[in-house]
Amino acid sequence: MSFSLIQPLSQIPLAFVDTETTGASADFGHRVIELGIARFENGKLVAQYEQLIDPQRRISAGVTALTGISNAMVTGQPTFSDQLPAAMKLLEGAAIIGHNIRFDLSFLRKEFRRCKLDIVSALSSAPVLDTVRIARRRFGRGGNALQRLAPRLGITPTAAHRALADALTTAYVFEKMMEAAKGWNTCLCDAYMEQGGPMGLLPANPRESLLPLELEEALEQRCPVIMEYLDSRQNRTQRKIDPLHILRRKGELILVAHCHLRNDRRTFRLERIVRMTRYEEQSLREAASDEEVASETPVEMSKEVPFQTAPPEVPESTVVQPMLFPTTEQV
């Protein structure tokens, strides 16, 4: 299908896509474990797809804690190549839209390549739209994670961190943000302008490194965050950190950060990070609910809070240019 810049969105099939993955970086061999697609035509949901996928590798403990998807759940499920024909029925002839879609595309490009397919040819150079880019132009950088952006727009998110649920929430967020233009009558050219310009299925920079959104923003802005982390003692802890930069070490991504709990620089394995929340937002929630989060004082985390499990820790190594996602630690 060919796409025209003057076509209104109502005349373009839109495929809202979300992936859940074994870890934070496709460049380090992490794989898709769940794919969700919601296809809209004429502004209406016409088809949806959701499938657990056997990644043929271990799922990180942080991902299991965040998504609830375990190694046992994906063992014996279809592989990505098994499910690609079914997924293509919803992707073909559609613009591709996602929340921080660059992250999802980094995984999908490699999965397509494993199937001996070029994603650009397979998807006919589909237009790409990113609700994160639109939100940043509308609200500024920071605080644009899907589960925080949706309520800001009056949308109640469905189950978080599952592929189809997040794809549907992204669709409703996109629809709401397009209201400031002409809704579904917004032409493709104007939709591009809403996000600051066109995007493609390939990265603008071939050496682009992608990280989870919350970490990316924390590294860019040098702002403190509250991190939930699975530590070396197999406890789930919560602490305030100042992210500094990312290391590559023995095939893993490591976050270097100042830990307020230890008042020292520490390293955290990316695969053990469950989630990150901006410190200001966490403080506002605490003030509103009058409840403490994991023994934290208004200034800093005062002690660790045990919750659940994690694999063993790693030592530290060489610095790589700052990248953009969440990460992990050495306690």
Task: Put a short name on every predicted segment.
Residues 1-6, 173-226:
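Acidic two-metal-ion nuclease catalytic site recognized across multiple nuclease folds
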Residues 1-113, 117-123, 140-143, 149-161:
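Conserved non-catalytic scaffold segment of RNase H-like nuclease domains
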Residues 19, 99, 131, 243, ...:
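Residues immediately flanking
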Residues 21-23, 133, 169:
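Short, glycine/acidic-enriched loop or turn micro-motifs at the edges of active sites
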Residues 126-142:
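Short alpha-helix plus adjacent loop in nuclease-associated cores
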Residues 162-175:
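Acidic, divalent-metal-coordinating active-site segment for phosphoryl/phosphodiester hydrolysis
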Residues 206-331:
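Core beta-strand-centered patch of the WYL/Sm-like small regulatory domain
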